[in-house]
Amino acid sequence: MNPIVGSIVALVTPMLEDGSVDYPTLRQLIDWHIAEGTACIGVVGTTGESPTVSVEEHCEIIRVAVEQTAGRVPVMAGAGGNSTREAIELARFAKKVGADCTLSVVPYYNKPSQEGIYQHFRAIAEAVDIPTVLYNVPGRTVADMLPETTLRLAQVPGVIGIKEATGNIERACWLIKQAPAGFSIYSGDDGTAVALMLLGGHGNVSVTANVAPRAMADLCRAAVAGDARTAREIHFKLLGLHKLLFAEPNPTPVKWAMHRLGLCAATMRLPMVPMSAHLEAGLEAAMREAGLL
């Protein structure tokens, strides 16, 4: 596959008031993102509430996303887990239905060593012939995949990039400097993504894109091209939004914001709960500053 460059939306999983997955709205959101310039549709990751959807729902969300996208842009299918065998099965399904690549998170809770992390991802890449993007988010997984392990995995056929969600720009710089040709470095942190891309990163797996897809697409396009002036202007316009969308655990604020825009219900499944009322005015103000209201 060709490298994915630009804004990759970490798409929410829309749900009806009864908590069931709202597939018609999922299809509408995908069409909207493509029209707004989003470069890739990422489904059933953190923002897509992968921990609280069933395996059957997880697979159906991937299938629907691939079907609705219909080759217009790539689909990055969440297919990670803390069981290597289960992650392999999800990757196999993603390949079967035509996803372009998978996003595979560092195993969580069982806290593998660096060697365990390496063997986990190598096993997935060797078992399933589908491009794999690694996902390092130690704030959620506890285990932190160190740059040395990432660079080691970059040599494994089929491992094509990493979503680096630490927000650590120095770390990102070392990865960009040392990664082999063809290995893509993506930000997983909206607040620092512009810096990562201006320094040579390839794109941003974005929560903010759920509510501001065109602005995020324009920001990524400018930053990847080295247009610091344009990227800086858009970044500062979105800065308050980046901050408020993480005022409570993701995807709580972004689902509230999407509901405010009439895009989908704010429904989530327990243990996620609605956003605290005292944050509503601030998030609405940030949305106005970003030109969304």
From Swiss-Prot:
UniProt superkingdom: Bacteria
Binding residue positions for pyruvate: 47, 205
Pfam families per UniProt: DHDPS (PF00701)
Listed SUPFAM superfamilies: Aldolase
Keywords recorded for this protein, A-Z: Amino-acid biosynthesis, Cytoplasm, Diaminopimelate biosynthesis, Lyase, Lysine biosynthesis, Schiff base
Cross-referenced InterPro entries: Aldolase_TIM (IPR013785), DapA (IPR005263), DapA-like (IPR002220), Schiff_base-form_aldolases_AS (IPR020625)
Pathway: Amino-acid biosynthesis; L-lysine biosynthesis via DAP pathway; (S)-tetrahydrodipicolinate from L-aspartate: step 3/4
The EC number(s) this enzyme carries: 4.3.3.7
Part of a proton relay during catalysis, annotated site positions: 46, 109
Catalytic activity: L-aspartate 4-semialdehyde + pyruvate = (2S,4S)-4-hydroxy-2,3,4,5-tetrahydrodipicolinate + H2O + H(+)
UniProt subcellular location: Cytoplasm
Residues the record marks as active site: 135 (proton donor/acceptor), 163 (schiff-base intermediate with substrate)
Molecular function as annotated in GO: 4-hydroxy-tetrahydrodipicolinate synthase activity
Cellular component GO terms, alphabetical: cytosol
One GO process term, biological-process aspect: diaminopimelate biosynthetic process
Family: Belongs to the DapA family.
Subunit structure: Homotetramer; dimer of dimers.
Entry-linked NCBIfam families: dapA
Protein purpose: Catalyzes the condensation of (S)-aspartate-beta-semialdehyde [(S)-ASA] and pyruvate to 4-hydroxy-tetrahydrodipicolinate (HTPA).
PANTHER family: 4-HYDROXY-2-OXOGLUTARATE ALDOLASE, MITOCHONDRIAL (PTHR12128:SF66), DIHYDRODIPICOLINATE SYNTHASE (PTHR12128)
Name the record gives this protein: 4-hydroxy-tetrahydrodipicolinate synthase
Source organism per UniProt: Leptothrix cholodnii (strain ATCC 51168 / LMG 8142 / SP-6) (Leptothrix discophora (strain SP-6))
